[in-house]
From Swiss-Prot:
GO molecular function: rRNA binding; structural constituent of ribosome
A GO CC term attached to the entry: plastid
Gene Ontology biological-process annotations: translation
Subunit (UniProt): Part of the 30S ribosomal subunit.
Name of one Pfam family that matches: Ribosomal_S8
Protein name (Swiss-Prot/TrEMBL): Small ribosomal subunit protein uS8c
Purpose: One of the primary rRNA binding proteins, it binds directly to 16S rRNA central domain where it helps coordinate assembly of the platform of the 30S subunit.
Organism, scientific name: Cuscuta reflexa (Southern Asian dodder)
Domain of life: Eukaryota
Amino acid sequence: MGRDTIAEIITSIRNADMDRKRVVRIASTHITENIVKLLLREGFFENVRKHRENNKNFFVLTLRHRRNKKRPLRNILKLKRISRPGLRIYYKSQKIPRILGGMGVIIISTSRGIMTDREARLEGIGGEILFYIW
């Protein structure tokens, strides 16, 4: 059985957010690079750096937390994996759901690459729903 790299990314980010850590390290692949760029553009990360250590590439993500006097507050409320290796979920462009009335973001793998639900609706293409983030 292969590794589900998308589930590993989601789990790493969720665990760091729940533990209120500011920095997360994830393995670097083409899929993770595209997903990280999207989430950075959507404002879920403050900074992304690519590092190489022992001939292995990885990303160092700085999570965006709101400041409080006692401790940082969580910013990411929920990450949910939808399509998985055992059950793929596909939607046409007209049927792509809206999360929290458009406040959440859906990451979709399309024939034109990985993009958000808004971009897929604008281009009129559907695809595989990878995960929700809100």
